[in-house]
């Protein structure tokens, strides 16, 4: 196993997780459950391919993907914040909605039920001279940027306040609903970028191409105890397990079924180790009147 090849592949695999987990931290620190990351990523991936296909520019695809993630985030925000719907139920519904919507428009735009035509991407390989894909840099910087916002800015203080003590925050003039709307919007944009990277790295959209990555990202948020840097480290750990799975696939001495379950087994073990010890934001998932 080539260490350089392992590292470069691990980084590429980790980028969608890093984007989505960073967005998940922002939303959950404000008190909104982020089971919707899978749907945000899927919406971002599809919108990125549509934007790139019709414009010929991957940068337009990036903007389109951000809008795609934001679209589903706004549905999530309106239903859970304004109408006070159950956040877990809405999270499941958003993910199913994203699958249905992308499948419908895949057929409408590209006359296919499985995949889009190939589109222009950024390249995505790590060369000796550095990274040739700007989204790699953005993905690696996502967690430090979120950490700075959460812990070093007035907005971050408000996010933490409404996630822990919304009544106290409201009593000193902080609009809990406004802060949560913004936090969920940021979550949608960042998770959408995770989908953008995934789609443009593969140069096409395929049906349900996120394949559970949003759920692994939210697992990283929990494993990282709602800290963006720790969540990023968890993303790298899960990406390393996925890379190991890929590079061991040609090893006939190990049963293929065991190799395929390595990343998911690691997620289960990691979460089992923090259950009961990880303390979420006090107001996470609670309906605000």
Indicate where each model-derived feature is located:
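Cytosolic-side transmembrane-helix boundaries in multi-pass membrane proteins
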Residues: 145, 154, 164-178, 248-289
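Hydrophobic alpha-helical transmembrane segments
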Residues: 7-10, 14, 39, 43, ...
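Membrane-interfacial amphipathic/re-entrant helices at transmembrane-helix boundaries
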Residues: 1-20, 33, 47, 55-60
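Hydrophobic core segments of alpha-helical transmembrane domains in multi-pass membrane transport
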Residues: 20-21, 45-49, 99-103, 138-148, ...
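Transmembrane helix-bundle core of multi-pass membrane transporters
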Residues: 87, 98-153, 203, 207, ...
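Alpha-helical transmembrane segments within multi-pass membrane transporters and channels
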Residues: 56-101, 141-144, 242
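Transmembrane alpha-helical segments in multi-pass inner-membrane proteins
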Residues: 205-264
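Helix-loop-helix "hairpin" substructures at the membrane interface of multi-pass membrane proteins
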Residues: 57, 130-205, 228-233
């Amino acid at each position: 196993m080539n260490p350089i090849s392992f590292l470069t592949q691990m980084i590429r695999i980790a980028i969608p997780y890093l984007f989505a987990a960073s967005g998940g931290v922002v939303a959950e620190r404000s008190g909104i459950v982020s089971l919707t990351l899978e749907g945000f990523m899927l919406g971002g991936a599809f919108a990125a391919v549509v934007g790139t296909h019709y414009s010929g520019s991957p940068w337009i695809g990036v903007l389109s993907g951000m809008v795609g993630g934001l679209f589903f985030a706004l549905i999530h925000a309106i239903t859970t914040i304004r109408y006070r719907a159950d956040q877990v139920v809405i999270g499941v519904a958003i993910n199913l909605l994203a699958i249905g919507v992308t499948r419908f428009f895949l057929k409408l735009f590209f006359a296919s039920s499985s995949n889009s035509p190939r589109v222009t991407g950024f390249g995505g390989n790590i060369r000796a001279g550095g990274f040739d894909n700007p989204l790699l840099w953005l993905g690696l910087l996502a967690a430090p940027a979120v950490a700075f916002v959460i812990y070093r800015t007035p907005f971050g203080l408000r996010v933490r306040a409404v996630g822990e003590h919304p009544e106290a925050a409201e009593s000193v003039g902080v609009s809990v609903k406004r802060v949560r709307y913004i936090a969920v919007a940021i979550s949608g944009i960042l998770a959408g970028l995770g989908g953008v990277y995934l789609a443009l790295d593969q140069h096409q959209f395929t049906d349900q191409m996120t394949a559970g990555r949003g759920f692994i990202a939210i697992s990283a948020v929990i494993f990282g105890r709602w800290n963006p840097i720790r969540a990023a480290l968890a993303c790298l750990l899960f990406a390393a397990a996925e890379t190991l799975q890929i590079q061991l696939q040609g090893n006939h001495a190990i049963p293929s079924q065991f190799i395929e379950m390595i990343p998911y087994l690691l997620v289960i073990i990691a979460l089992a180790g923090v259950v009961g010890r990880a303390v979420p934001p006090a107001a996470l998932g609670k309906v605000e009147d």
